[in-house]
């Protein structure tokens, strides 16, 4: 698997590179975000990107947006800032996960593995589960990993797809933010975590939902989200 690493801090980029190569991953390492952008434009064999947020010239957010114009592979952002602003911004424009500097190499590796596993296996449906869902013009095929709305294709990232499928799989029932987070990310949920909310907003945007009156993904305030049968 090929992983793109972009960080203008040479020590950080080199550390990430060593961590991943020691685990058998192929890496593409860039200290220059402009050179990385050119790589993104021409290389369609990247499986995951690790992007630093604060870089001169083209920052990590701009690179993330550039990737999302063409690809759905996972993106992990690196940030030196502890607050939620960077995290929410990154998730809103298409990032899948965040790691705060300084980081534990084992944590970074675990997040990389989790994202790659989700990316490579998202289309594998369990035999006991139904494989399609249809309601109000929305059609989802889990086996083919396709989504359409009134026959128009909707392009979702693997994480967005898993969230939408979880809601549709439980259509008619409210699914809590905690349940969504722990099912999709397989980590303990914190009450202050805005990750689910930001991903729901992105999915709604792609489904062209009216912000004040969404028709497909309903918010049940204080409880969670649901899709009607």
Where are these regions (language model features)?
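Short hydrophobic/Thr-rich beta-strand motif most characteristic of the beta2 strand and flanking loop
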Residues: 24-32, 39
């Amino acid at each position: 698997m090929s992983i793109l690493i972009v960080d203008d801090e040479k020590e950080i980029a080199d550390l990430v590179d060593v961590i991943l190569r020691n685990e058998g991953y192929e890496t593409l390492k860039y200290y220059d975000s402009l050179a990385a952008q050119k790589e993104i434009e021409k290389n369609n064999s990247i499986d995951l990107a690790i992007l630093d947020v604060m870089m001169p010239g083209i920052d990590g957010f701009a690179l993330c947006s550039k990737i999302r114009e063409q690809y759905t592979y996972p993106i992990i952002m690196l940030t030196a800032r502890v607050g939620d602003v960077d995290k929410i911004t990154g998730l809103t424009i298409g990032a899948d996960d965040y790691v705060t500097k300084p980081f534990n190499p084992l944590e970074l590796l675990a997040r990389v593995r989790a994202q790659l596993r989700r990316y490579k296996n998202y289309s594998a449906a369990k035999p006991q589960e139904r494989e399609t869902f249809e309601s109000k013009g929305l059609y989802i095929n889990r086996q083919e990993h396709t989504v359409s709305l009134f026959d128009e294709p909707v392009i979702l990232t693997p994480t967005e797809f898993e969230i939408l499928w979880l809601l549709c799989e439980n259509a008619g029932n409210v699914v809590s933010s905690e349940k969504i987070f722990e099912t999709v990310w397989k980590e303990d949920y914190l009450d202050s975590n805005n990750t689910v909310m930001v991903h729901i907003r992105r999915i709604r945007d792609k489904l062209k939902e009216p912000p004040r009156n969404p028709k497909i993904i309903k918010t049940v305030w204080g409880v969670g989200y649901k899709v009607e049968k």
